[in-house]
Swiss-Prot record:
Native species: Aliarcobacter butzleri (strain RM4018) (Arcobacter butzleri)
Gene3D superfamilies recorded: Ribosomal protein L33
The family this protein is said to belong to: Belongs to the bacterial ribosomal protein bL33 family.
Any single biological process term in GO: translation
Keywords: Ribonucleoprotein, Ribosomal protein
InterPro entries named among the record's database cross-references: Ribosomal_bL33, Ribosomal_bL33_CS, Ribosomal_bL33_sf, Ribosomal_zn-bd
Keyword Nucleotide-binding: no
Gene (name only): rpmG
Molecular function GO labels: structural constituent of ribosome
The protein, known as: Large ribosomal subunit protein bL33
Length: 56
């Protein structure tokens, strides 16, 4: 199982509070919080999305 180290995270919009995207992350190589500008369908514009833990 090569992907056993990777964890699934959600990307939460900082303006609307919605979790719009999910992705995978290796916490050993990327220790800082993931932050990226992505499209928010509720607000219909690009906003900052930050990493949140998902319930398994």
């Amino acid at each position: 199982m090569a992907n056993a180290v990777r964890i699934k995270i959600g990307l939460k919009c900082q303006e609307s509070g919605d979790i719009n995207y999910t992705t995978w992350k290796n916490p050993k190589t990327h220790t800082e919080k993931f932050e990226v500008k992505k499209y928010c369908p509720r607000l219909k514009k690009h906003t900052t999305h930050k990493e949140v833990k998902l319930k398994s």
